[in-house]
Amino acid sequence: MRKASIRLVLLGLALMALGLTSTAAAAPSVKVEVKVLPILKNQSKPKGGFWPHTGNFFGAPAALETKFKVTGTEYGGTPAPIRKVAVWLPKGVQITTKGFPTCALSTLQAKEPEKCPKLSLASPAGHAPESAPENCPPPAPLAGGAGEACGVVSLGGTRVHESVKIQAYFAPGGGLNFYIEGVTPTSIEVPFGGAFQGASGLFGRKFVTEVPLIETLPGAPAAVAETTSVTIGAAIKKGKKLISLGTIPKKCPKGGFPGKGEIWFGAGPESTWEKVTNEVKVPCPKK
């Protein structure tokens, strides 16, 4: 079975790296669009309705849809693989993982995501695309649907495009685990995890994840990401209280919420990776 991984950990993980643009000449360029959404009542049923009083409001529980496009030619005509992502969140953003069922990384490494508790889903459920595109289209709005990504993989000595599903799960210890699945033209089953950490200054928390370099063929170029769309956000009811993974701050600084994202690209040792960094202002919700 051939295995590949589209370098798209930025999912959601870029789940809050708002408005990234490359500042390094040798690194890829990353364009990000973000939309705050209400939270699905049931992540396993994307058309099952949303929790009331969630979405883009001050102090409200919310989900975050992130769409991004990566461009570059430094890796044989394509962007280099993503190796690490760090996302800083503004002060006042509440992140809560306690109380949610979890799915262990070992379960995903065993390629048994069906054994994960349904309430451990941190993103809408879906199925891997059953057809491969000739080229990656612009990332489309999900409207509460499952995360998808498109990129380039090596197959039979050539570079071809492939689309995959992205699924996020609550992880033991308070982080998030991700599972990327594709069926054509290569079989893709790639798990990885990330953790929330403390931050200082303008930021309250940060999320950090590392992505393994995956080669489809020995000695062939690794898989890379070109576009992705993913929604991260979940909530459960405990008695009369709604517990949400993410909650918007009750106040917004003049000019918007500060945000920061760093992404490392490369196929060699860590010392050769190129880092893309940007600090941005996220518009305040309308009152």
Where are these regions (language model features)?
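N-terminal regions of proteins, emphasizing targeting and processing segments when present
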Residues: 10-13, 36
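C-terminal segment of classical bacterial N-terminal signal peptides
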Residues: 16-25
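Bacterial N-terminal signal peptides that target proteins for export
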Residues: 1-10
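Ser/Thr/Pro/Gly-rich, low-complexity intrinsically disordered stalk/linker tracts of secreted
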Residues: 25-287
